[in-house]
A protein has these predicted regions:
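Conserved SAM/SAH cofactor-binding pocket of Class I
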Residues: 1-64, 70
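Short conserved AdoMet
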Residues: 20, 97, 121
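Short beta->alpha hinge that forms the Motif I/post-I loop of the SAM-binding pocket
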Residues: 29-33, 84, 107
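A short SAM/SAH-binding and catalytic strip from SAM-dependent methyltransferases
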Residues: 69-79
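A short glycine-rich, Lys/Arg-flanked "PGG" loop and its adjoining helix->strand segment in the class I
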Residues: 86-98
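Conserved beta-strand signature within the Rossmann-like core of class I S-adenosyl-L-methionine
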Residues: 99-105
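Conserved class I S-adenosyl-L-methionine
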Residues: 108-119
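Core SAM-dependent methyltransferase catalytic element
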Residues: 121, 128-139
């Protein structure tokens, strides 16, 4: 069993998938609407998990995880904003256990590789279909 954080959980599909596989899931989203949708997804599927409203790591002080998963948002209305994703990556080492992993799904054009390199000292690309990439960085 891994202790997993689903950052920007939305309606909880990834959280439910992880919980169904026996992982201890904490799901967070800045949106109260999304957090409630995630709670309902877990409840309706008889799955356990902790769901919190949190602006990135704000509700998770002192918490550490084996894995952090996210498809980080980069839009604020119609503008591109890297604020949340920047904090997600830069502060990940403080919230990962030793050998913990940060796994991101992202549009291929987003500038995450450089940030992952700086924050965690490296990364690998697990999947790349030219439109989306899945990155994994290990602490």
């Amino acid at each position: 069993t891994l202790k997993v954080l689903d950052m920007g959980c939305g309606d909880g599909i990834i959280s439910a998938w992880l919980a169904k596989r026996g992982h201890a899931v904490t799901a967070v989203d800045v949106s109260a609407f999304a957090a409630e949708a995630c709670r309902r997804t877990l409840h309706d599927n008889a799955l356990d998990g902790t769901v919190l409203e949190s602006d990135v790591y704000s509700a998770l002080e002192g918490e550490r995880f084996d894995v952090i998963v996210s498809n980080p948002p980069f839009h604020q209305e119609r503008d591109i904003s890297y604020g949340p994703s920047t904090r997600l990556i830069d502060e990940a080492p403080e919230h990962l256990n030793a050998k913990g992993q940060l796994i991101l799904v992202a549009n291929a054009f987003l500038p995450y590789p450089e940030r992952l390199q700086r924050a965690l000292g490296g990364f690998e690309t697990l999947s790349d279909n030219r439109r989306f990439r899945v990155y994994r960085a290990t602490k």
